[in-house]
Amino acid sequence: MLLKELSEAIGVSGDESAVRQIVYNAIKDHVTDIEVDSIGNLTAFQKGIGDNLPRVMLAAHMDEIGFMVTGHDSNGNLRFASIGGVDDRILPGLRVKVGKKQVPGVIMWTPIHMNQDQNVTKMKDLRIDIGASSKGEAEGKVGRGERVGFDSYYEQIEGTRMARGKSFDDRVGCSVLIDVLQNGPYPVDIIAAFTVQEEVGLRGATVAAQRLKPDMAIVLEGTTAHDIPDPMADPDDPTTPNPA
């Protein structure tokens, strides 16, 4: 399933290559003029039905939030910093994959019985344990500057139309855009832009829009809905049954 493959791929902002390859394989037979620009966006063109058609850019970003390795401790643990908006509260105990080799690791913190003040542990005080016992061993497995992604899997929730997984922001958008291209052409010329580095400042989309200069653009993006945890939280904005 395409969404499963997209969701489980790791593409932290600045290194979206794994996601880009999945997208390329899915659209290459349905478009022309596939390009990867200098920042890493994958763009493609699909000629519409007719002449002198409007040029519509459909955009979805390939990247996800994550981390970067910033150093190695003497005991083999990794120091790291966030890429994109990561909430410190969710980190302790999370499984991650580190670097090009996708070395498995766990984000660790001071055991709860030693953390008497019960405050949220800041990211600077957390470490990633990759099973190394020395700085040299850790450096042999993972280099400074390598990306760290969440180790999660995709699954359908039984008996529902729902699914769980990571990076639905914005792999769902990528999946929808791929589906659009696979079912074209349409009475417009489509410029598909699978963009990079959205989570760190909309960088790829800015480059794509300036370079491609479409007549109009539609961005396929995810956001929160009000069905969880309280469907009555905002009764004037019922997004429960609909895309937002």
Can you name each region flagged by the protein language model?
Residues 1-244:
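N-terminal hydrophobic/helix-forming segments and targeting peptides
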